[in-house]
């Protein structure tokens, strides 16, 4: 399976550097970013598009899907952003990710969700091309899982808006083909929130 991982386009929460809720829609720049990643991926023969149910990811996935009318469009809760608890609507610099309160989803929980969604896609589309459209925290967990890193690994894995990472999974072997590539945004710009 060829797995393409991308993050949603820019939102107001990204611009303001706050941790936003499920209804944070794409900005006009976020829509441009989604259009750019869509055009970049239009020659891929995508079999399935898995999306988070959150508006920002779903809209990005819908824009990608316009070039892939035969791809199965699947909303999956395992691709939701991490549960933010008391960190919801806080500024990024107000948050201590090393000492998470109990109401904030930890890296191990995200890693378990990552494992579930990767294995689900792999079982349904073992020879297919699949794209995940999701969020920063869960995408980082998916990449940690595919790299066989410890769930609590704190190494910074950047996830720019609509950045693309590609992994080839075959016969139990995983090859990373591309990581956090945003060349499709050269004329638009990107941020790393």
Question: Where do the PLM segments sit?
Answer:
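Loop-to-helix element that buttresses phosphate recognition and phosphoryl-transfer chemistry
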Residues: 3-59, 103-115
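General small-molecule cofactor/ligand-binding pocket signal
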Residues: 4, 74-76, 177
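Short active-site segment of divalent metal-dependent hydrolases/proteases
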Residues: 11, 138-139
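Phosphate-coordination/substrate-recognition cap region in phosphate-metabolizing enzymes
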Residues: 35-101
């Amino acid at each position: 399976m060829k797995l393409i991982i991308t993050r949603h386009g820019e939102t107001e929460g990204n611009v303001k550097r706050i941790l936003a809720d499920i209804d944070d829609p794409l900005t006009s720049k976020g829509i441009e970013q989604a259009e750019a990643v869509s055009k970049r991926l239009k020659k891929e023969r995508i079999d399935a598009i898995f999306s988070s149910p959150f508006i920002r990811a779903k809209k990005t996935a819908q824009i990608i899907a316009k070039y892939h009318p035969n791809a199965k469009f699947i909303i999956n809760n395992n691709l939701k952003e991490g549960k933010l608890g008391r960190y919801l609507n806080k500024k990024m610099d107000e948050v201590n990710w090393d000492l998470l309160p109990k109401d904030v989803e930890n890296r191990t929980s995200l890693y378990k969700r990552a494992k579930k969604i990767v294995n689900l896609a792999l079982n349904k589309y073992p020879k297919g091309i699949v794209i995940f459209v999701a969020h920063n925290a869960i995408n980082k967990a998916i990449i940690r899982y595919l790299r066989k890193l410890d769930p609590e690994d704190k190494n910074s894995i950047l996830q720019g808006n609509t950045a693309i990472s590609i992994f080839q999974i075959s016969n139990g072997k995983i090859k990373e083909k591309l990581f956090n590539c945003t060349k499709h945004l050269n004329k638009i710009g990107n941020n790393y929130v």
